[in-house]
């Protein structure tokens, strides 16, 4: 996260809601920079960021319980506009002199709001007497308002569903405007930001790019940077941004573990060397990785072997270069947001990149993380700003351990080659059908099962290939893609005819939950 004040920003105080990140997404979509801070460090975050408005999140906690989370007093003493969502509304009311009780009539799911009076937050959106769908998820509810507040909208089970103190620019809602099930929610948040707080909404990837380049130059100076390039979108965008800032001071290392998709490593190397003039080392470590993985069937053991070998290989190559002062990483904002424990102290969970986890400490390097303020879709937008083609930016997610976790059971070179060919044919058919961009992720899985088949006049005993395709918004939940049978038949026929070693193809129709997207 940024360490300095950020003009025209919004501070989001997180009380532990599972959808707090959606609030940040809605603010960013309105063209405004924001940061999420846990309630325990909200005062420090307020002083550091110097925001122009504050949003208080929901929470699984109950405001009536002793020791439940509170917003720091400075937020209400500052004179800034405040928007309380669900628990945020309740704690705002309690802290300003109102009352909250445990609800006898809980509200979960779709509800309808009756607008009782006009409100500045409704400008161009809602009017008195209108009715609107919202999404509720609360047990407690406000029973008495603080001085200065008025009810502006109600629902059947929430007489204080939408309250406002227009003079102080305080607003509280019992529903969740940040979720898609509240159709006008994003517009309400936009009205709060633009109309109430007066923030322009001119934060863009172009402006972010310029600022990031300046910050990288100031941090790195004339020192050297190395970056682990995986071929994925995150590490690629980070590398291009660092390269724009410091040029030849950056060296990228692509450790090819032999577990990538067909022709993937060669394509990445060609693109970055030929089109972006990046100093890139392509390290062919396939024999090293596959040699240790052969016969290993436990998925967690596979991951640990791959992670350890990656660090060892990367470290060896970095030392051959004479080392570096900085390590570039494609860390994203969701990776660094602190998780909130509303029952105790802050529970900080910072995910390290699966490839370079322990490298900064081992090699005494400082991190350069130019994407750590961005969400995934913003990274893609920045990639376009930097000139990466849509065909690269829009690629489906690919796991760090690669094909190793799409080959359940023991791994062999032969199995990986069979899988690689089947996967390439499957993706080719998806692109030919114009379906690639409609699918979140699609891939082939080579099962550790052989079945009897007949090809020509001969009997075969070969592997089963499972095809997987899902639709999703964020990868947290997913549904299987509903192909027509003609497409599946065409893809299966090509795989069986063109890939020696497969004689049966099946399609995975499992959603997440209960299944996961990947098989291992």
UniProtKB/Swiss-Prot annotation:
Its EC number is 6.3.5.2. Catalyzes the synthesis of GMP from XMP. Pfam families: GATase, GMP_synt_C, tRNA_Me_trans. Residues 203-395 form the GMPS ATP-PPase domain. Homodimer. It comes from Rhizobium johnstonii (strain DSM 114642 / LMG 32736 / 3841) (Rhizobium leguminosarum bv. viciae). The gene is guaA. Residues 9-202 form the Glutamine amidotransferase type-1 domain. Signal peptide: none annotated. Pathway: Purine metabolism; GMP biosynthesis; GMP from XMP (L-Gln route): step 1/1. This is GMP synthase [glutamine-hydrolyzing]. Keywords: ATP-binding, Glutamine amidotransferase, GMP biosynthesis, Ligase, Nucleotide-binding, Purine biosynthesis. The active site is at 86 (nucleophile), 176, 178. Gene3D superfamilies: 3.30.300.10, 3.40.50.880, HUPs (3.40.50.620). GO terms for cellular component: cytosol. One of its GO terms (molecular function) is GMP synthase activity. ATP binds at residues 230-236.
């Amino acid at each position: 996260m940024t360490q300095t004040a950020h003009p025209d920003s919004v501070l989001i105080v997180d009380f532990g809601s599972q959808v707090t990140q959606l609030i940040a997404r809605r603010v960013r979509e309105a063209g405004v920079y924001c940061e999420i801070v846990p309630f325990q460090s909200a005062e420090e975050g307020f002083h550091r960021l110097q925001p122009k408005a504050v949003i208080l999140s929901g929470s699984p906690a109950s405001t009536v319980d002793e020791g439940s989370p509170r917003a720091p007093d400075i937020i209400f003493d500052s004179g800034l506009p405040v928007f309380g969502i669900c628990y945020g509304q309740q704690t705002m009311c309690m802290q300003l002199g109102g009352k909250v009780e445990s609800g006898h009539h809980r509200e979960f799911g779709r509800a309808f709001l009756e607008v009782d009076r006009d409100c500045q937050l409704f400008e161009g959106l809602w009017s008195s007497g209108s009715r609107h769908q919202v999404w509720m998820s609360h047990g407690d509810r406000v029973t008495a308002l603080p001085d200065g507040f008025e009810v502006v909208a109600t629902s059947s089970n929430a007489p204080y569903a939408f309250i406002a103190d227009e003079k102080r620019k305080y607003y509280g809602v019992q529903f969740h405007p940040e979720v898609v099930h509240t159709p006008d929610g994003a517009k309400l948040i936009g009205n709060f930001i633009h109309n109430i707080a007066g923030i322009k909404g001119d934060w863009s990837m172009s402006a972010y790019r310029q600022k990031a380049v300046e910050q990288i130059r100031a941090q790195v100076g004339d020192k050297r940077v190395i970056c682990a390039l995986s071929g994925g979108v995150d590490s690629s965008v980070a590398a291009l941004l660092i390269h724009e800032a410091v040029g030849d001071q950056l060296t990228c290392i692509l450790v090819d573990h032999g577990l990538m998709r067909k022709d993937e490593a060669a394509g990445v190397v060609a693109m970055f060397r030929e089109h972006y003039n990046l100093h890139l080392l392509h390290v062919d470590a396939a024999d090293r990785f596959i040699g240790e993985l052969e016969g290993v069937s436990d998925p967690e053991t596979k991951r640990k072997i791959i992670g350890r070998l990656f660090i060892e290989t990367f470290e060896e190559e970095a030392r051959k270069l004479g080392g570096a002062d900085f390590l570039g990483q494609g860390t994203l904002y969701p990776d660094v947001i602190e998780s909130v424990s509303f029952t105790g102290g802050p529970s900080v969970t910072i995910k390290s990149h699966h490839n370079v986890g322990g490298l900064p400490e081992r090699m005494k390097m400082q991190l350069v993380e130019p994407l750590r303020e961005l969400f995934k879709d913003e990274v893609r937008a920045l990639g376009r700003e930097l000139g990466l083609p849509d065909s690269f930016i829009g690629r489906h997610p690919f796991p760090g351990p690669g094909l190793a976790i799409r080959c359940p059971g023991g791994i062999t070179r032969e199995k990986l080659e069979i899988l690689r060919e089947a996967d390439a044919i499957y993706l080719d058919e998806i692109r030919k059908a114009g379906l690639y961009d409609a699918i979140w992720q699609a891939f082939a899985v080579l099962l550790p099962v052989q079945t009897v088949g007949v090809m020509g006049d001969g009997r075969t005993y070969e592997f089963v290939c499972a095809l997987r395709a899902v639709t999703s918004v964020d990868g947290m939940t997913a549904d299987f893609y509903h192909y027509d049978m003609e497409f599946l038949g065409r893809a299966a026929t090509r795989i069986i005819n063109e890939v020696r070693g497969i004689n049966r193809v099946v399609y995975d129709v499992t959603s997440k939950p209960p299944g996961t997207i990947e098989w291992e």
